[in-house]
């Protein structure tokens, strides 16, 4: 190991490890170098995988990966021969973005995305947001909820970083966004809190299909309030096609109209 380290230090022209009585520690320059070295090793592994493997690393924001994406993965893996594996990684939207930018993902489906020159992106689907209330809530029979009425309702908060906050800022405009109640960290926690009568919240309609069907929750539509879910993938070199699962999702989106 010491010989390899010495050779590397000779190549880069700086000291990477400093020895002392307490042991060896990386130098400041080594710490600055490590993220780049890690990225190069990851790129090397991805290049080998492209030659010998057929596994696609797909990231998904928590709500998308939990409530929307699974049937598409199943369909992709079962409707054609010689398709590779899908390594589905579900995380909070900011974490998915970080993994995508770091080259740890081949594609991602996200609740929001800031355009980047190294990536292609396309609208995957438009998902309505609904107000969820318990069946015995005063608004349970209200039907549709208009913006002016919605702004006065304190909301239970779900997962941070999902983009809902900025969406509400745009939607409510000069009215101001509704007051925030408890911040519960996930859509599942929000649903349980609403069922228990602790408040109301805004979620994607697909996240509460089962609860609405069973009568455990009531979902009230909100005109004009929706999320535009994005499909993102790294721009392929030359004229190569995007990853297979990306093509599958694009085809499904085109068929859906």
Short names for language-model regions:
Residues 7-26:
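A short LG(V/I)-centered, amphipathic sequence patch enriched
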Residues 11-12, 33-55:
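Alpha-helical linker/hinge and terminal dimerization helices associated
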Residues 54-117:
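Central regulatory/effector-binding core of bacterial HTH transcription factors
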Residues 57-59, 129-130, 145-165, 253-254:
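Short loop->beta-strand "edge-of-pocket" segments that line small-molecule binding or catalytic clefts
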Residues 68, 218-257:
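A late-sequence structural motif
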Residues 92-97, 101-105, 110-111, 163-217:
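Hydrophobic hinge/microswitch elements
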Residues 116-155, 243:
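Flexible hinge/capping segments at coil-to-helix
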Residues 154-175, 239-247, 255-257:
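Secondary-structure junction motif
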